[in-house]
């Protein structure tokens, strides 16, 4: 029997590709393709969906996630914009409901490997900054991938970074800080998704860069998440935990 899936945000560029990918997969059946005006909770009840893949917007992803879990479906969240307190609340709710779920800041397997490699490098380089770039339709900054990368690096590095007595002549020139790691966000035409993690040491730098040049690079990760989520009874933050 095929797994019943709703794609929320089905009319967007990612949503269209996700529908195409999942429809052509023998394990899955798409039972609804939803957009902003549709009633997500009622659709879950009507279709008896087991999984909801959310590819919507940062301004509604938290409420969507609550709706999915409270209606007994398993969330596969590919929308950025969730902050740490919201992720904590969703984690607790999944524990109470004994429902598995996945929040994936990035579905690209290459991006996940970039994050893993950066985490390893942070054991040896304490000085690091992140430069992320996306298309101009991405309204939240920094990206979920950059935030997750900073969290992984902060948890792994063995000594704090140097405290520099700098004065910003233009406010924000040094970027934003997350877990004491500076993040710089670019929003430019011609970009899809790009991230560089730049480490510095005495006499050397190390750059780990990933470029997404076609949204199809995210599809294997969506398939993997949908395959794995039914076997979970907790919320997983980051696709790296499923590899």
Swiss-Prot record:
<feature type="binding site">
    <location>
        <begin position="104"/>
        <end position="107"/>
    </location>
    <ligand>
        <name>NAD(+)</name>
    </ligand>
</feature>
<feature type="binding site">
    <location>
        <begin position="144"/>
        <end position="145"/>
    </location>
    <ligand>
        <name>(S)-2,3,4,5-tetrahydrodipicolinate</name>
    </ligand>
</feature>
<dbReference type="InterPro" id="IPR022664">
    <property type="entry name" value="DapB_N_CS"/>
</dbReference>
<keyword id="KW-0521">NADP</keyword>
<dbReference type="InterPro" id="IPR036291">
    <property type="entry name" value="NAD(P)-bd_dom_sf"/>
</dbReference>
<feature type="binding site">
    <location>
        <begin position="78"/>
        <end position="80"/>
    </location>
    <ligand>
        <name>NAD(+)</name>
    </ligand>
</feature>
<dbReference type="InterPro" id="IPR000846">
    <property type="entry name" value="DapB_N"/>
</dbReference>
<dbReference type="GO" id="GO:0009089">
    <property type="term" value="P:lysine biosynthetic process via diaminopimelate"/>
</dbReference>
<dbReference type="GO" id="GO:0019877">
    <property type="term" value="P:diaminopimelate biosynthetic process"/>
</dbReference>
<feature type="active site" description="Proton donor/acceptor">
    <location>
        <position position="134"/>
    </location>
</feature>
<dbReference type="InterPro" id="IPR023940">
    <property type="entry name" value="DHDPR_bac"/>
</dbReference>
<keyword id="KW-0520">NAD</keyword>
<comment type="pathway">
    <text>Amino-acid biosynthesis; L-lysine biosynthesis via DAP pathway; (S)-tetrahydrodipicolinate from L-aspartate: step 4/4.</text>
</comment>
<dbReference type="InterPro" id="IPR022663">
    <property type="entry name" value="DapB_C"/>
</dbReference>
<feature type="active site" description="Proton donor">
    <location>
        <position position="138"/>
    </location>
</feature>
<keyword id="KW-0220">Diaminopimelate biosynthesis</keyword>
<comment type="similarity">
    <text>Belongs to the DapB family.</text>
</comment>
<dbReference type="GO" id="GO:0005829">
    <property type="term" value="C:cytosol"/>
</dbReference>
<dbReference type="GO" id="GO:0050661">
    <property type="term" value="F:NADP binding"/>
</dbReference>
<feature type="binding site">
    <location>
        <position position="135"/>
    </location>
    <ligand>
        <name>(S)-2,3,4,5-tetrahydrodipicolinate</name>
    </ligand>
</feature>
<dbReference type="GO" id="GO:0051287">
    <property type="term" value="F:NAD binding"/>
</dbReference>
<keyword id="KW-0457">Lysine biosynthesis</keyword>
<dbReference type="GO" id="GO:0008839">
    <property type="term" value="F:4-hydroxy-tetrahydrodipicolinate reductase"/>
</dbReference>
<dbReference type="Pfam" id="PF05173">
    <property type="entry name" value="DapB_C"/>
</dbReference>
<keyword id="KW-0028">Amino-acid biosynthesis</keyword>
<keyword id="KW-0560">Oxidoreductase</keyword>
<comment type="function">
    <text>Catalyzes the conversion of 4-hydroxy-tetrahydrodipicolinate (HTPA) to tetrahydrodipicolinate.</text>
</comment>
<feature type="binding site">
    <location>
        <begin position="9"/>
        <end position="14"/>
    </location>
    <ligand>
        <name>NAD(+)</name>
    </ligand>
</feature>
<protein>
    <recommendedName>
        <fullName>4-hydroxy-tetrahydrodipicolinate reductase</fullName>
        <ecNumber>1.17.1.8</ecNumber>
    </recommendedName>
</protein>
<keyword id="KW-0963">Cytoplasm</keyword>
<dbReference type="GO" id="GO:0016726">
    <property type="term" value="F:oxidoreductase activity, acting on CH or CH2 groups, NAD or NADP as acceptor"/>
</dbReference>
<dbReference type="Pfam" id="PF01113">
    <property type="entry name" value="DapB_N"/>
</dbReference>
């Amino acid at each position: 029997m095929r797994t019943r899936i709703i794609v929320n945000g089905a009319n967007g560029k990612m949503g269209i590709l996700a529908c195409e990918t999942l429809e052509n997969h023998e394990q899955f059946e798409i039972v609804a393709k939803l957009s902003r005006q549709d009633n997500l909770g009622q659709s879950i009840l009507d279709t008896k969906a087991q999984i909801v893949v959310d590819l919507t917007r940062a301004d509604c992803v938290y409420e969507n996630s609550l709706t999915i879990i409270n209606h007994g479906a398993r969330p596969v969240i590919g929308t950025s914009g969730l902050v740490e307190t919201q992720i904590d609340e969703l984690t607790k709710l999944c524990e109470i409901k004994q429902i598995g779920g996945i929040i994936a800041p990035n579905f690209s397997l290459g991006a996940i490997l970039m994050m893993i490699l950066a985490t390893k490098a942070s054991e040896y380089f304490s000085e690091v900054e992140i430069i992320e770039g996306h298309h101009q339709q991405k309204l939240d900054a920094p990206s979920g991938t950059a935030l997750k990368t900073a969290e992984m690096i902060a948890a792994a590095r063995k000594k704090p970074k140097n405290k520099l007595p700098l004065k910003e002549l233009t406010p924000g020139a040094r970027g934003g800080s997350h877990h004491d790691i500076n993040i710089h966000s670019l929003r430019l035409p011609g970009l899809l998704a790009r991230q560089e993690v730049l480490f510095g040491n005495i006499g050397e730098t190390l750059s780990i860069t990933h470029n997404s040049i076609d949204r199809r690079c995210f599809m294997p990760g969506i398939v993997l998440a949908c395959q794995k989520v039914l076997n979970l009874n907790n919320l997983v933050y980051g696709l790296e935990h499923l590899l």
